[in-house]
């Protein structure tokens, strides 16, 4: 989606999730910053970018364009021009003053420092909030990390709990405990966006098992949509009440198309599936 947007922030997209969940237009996985840790993610968003490196890349592309063979030249020119535009925008942003932002880049999984408990998901959401507030990115991706089971007192990680929660009540209770934590983090994030007067201009999409034993379905996945100026409806049941086991009456692909519409991207389908939820959400 970000490739359809005019770049109005330092980066068009920032992927800090811990899974392969983002792909580019060529179906290649977008590398994540997650493994770099919070300090380097913060430096990526709020650190100085050497302009000489970008200028050298621009110069190299210009030199390579001049040396293109006449045969099939047109097939390469468009790609070179796209890279030049991207680098020129990157250079423009690199020359702008970087906002001075205070942020604790250390992980505090237990409150040994008197500064409160901070786990990776809370930290990532706070990085996203600051990134939005100070125009460091337009599209952000994060995901609840592989949790430290000892900190939460559960016997499995979140993903494993989603597979086992239907087996016995105690395992379901563990998944519920984790999801209450994740949704608590999300609630605080939304509250902070609202305080910053950013929520109405920020589309927030959050998915998970939501303590449903029937999780891991790509078609029927509990999904929370917040902000973005939508006409929010509360709970929207996607199954057809007259035929619960039949095709869904509202699909995730339709939701994605409506989100793209709200972002100003005029598309009528997502992944080959047509339709939208505009009549419900806008």
Model-derived regions, located:
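Ligand-binding pockets and gating/stacking loops
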Residues: 1-282
